[in-house]
């Protein structure tokens, strides 16, 4: 259901319980997190440093971990993969080369904790945070994920200890048709309609609905969200070929404005929005998803 006035809805994504106690640029000392030593990631991906000079280039950042899991009176399970999405970012938001360098030179640990009965995996980057960076991992130094979202096996019956054995940074360049808010919208305080797909993933920010689409609605404040809600059943999710955990939505061209977006114009193409989600994310549309207002830049605070 759409909610036009509840700005706090988006705040749950900015400050969810797992890391609410840790403010910007406050990194947790390693000895408070784990006995293991931090590990530095390897690199795979579509990195072309020439792209750092192109403002309309976007990349998706993911940490892919291999962990050993041990529990009391149970055999250690080795080589368990974990998928840890860090977010999608454009060069308008932060220089690509600086982001990749900061991620690759960081040392990481992984721990597990429970909050309100829900098990979480927390990734901790040791070192200095970058307060204004769009990616939470670089801004605050730690990021938490629901365990069953990022680890494909079910380890829900016991408290486990994680030992990080391998870590890879995956950088995937988004195709040229990717829509992102233009620079002035991105660094300003404009909120966009967005679709919430998972409580612990940021909402998917959508382009502005064309004016004629919400003239039908009597309340102008609810207009953009109600217009989105009315067409959720039309949205279809596609897995992006040859990309890991990257999905896209092609939006109806007659409903959405692309003028303020960064996508390269290709005739009458519809806006295409890309987002990160687990590989088993359902492709059966967005019915019953919540529509919210969201900032394109997650470093902004709701007002």
UniProtKB/Swiss-Prot annotation:
Q: Which InterPro entries match?
A: EV_matrix (IPR008986), EV_matrix_protein_N (IPR043079), EV_matrix_sf (IPR038057)
- Give the record's family classification: Belongs to the filoviridae matrix protein VP40 family.
Question: One Pfam family this chain carries?
Answer: Matrix_Filo
Q: Where is this motif: PPXY motif?
A: 16-19
Source species of the chain: Lake Victoria marburgvirus (strain Popp-67)
Please identify the protein, giving its name as recorded: Matrix protein VP40
Which gene is the coding source of this polypeptide chain? VP40
Main localization (coarse) = virion
What keywords is this UniProt entry annotated with? Answer: Host cell membrane, Host endosome, Host membrane, Host-virus interaction, Inhibition of host innate immune response by virus, Inhibition of host interferon signaling pathway by virus, Inhibition of host JAK1 by virus, Interferon antiviral system evasion, Membrane, Viral budding, Viral budding via the host ESCRT complexes, Viral immunoevasion, Viral matrix protein, Viral release from host cell, Virion
Q: Which molecular function terms from Gene Ontology are attached?
A: structural constituent of virion
- Annotated GO CC locations: host cell endomembrane system; host cell late endosome membrane; host cell plasma membrane; membrane; virion membrane
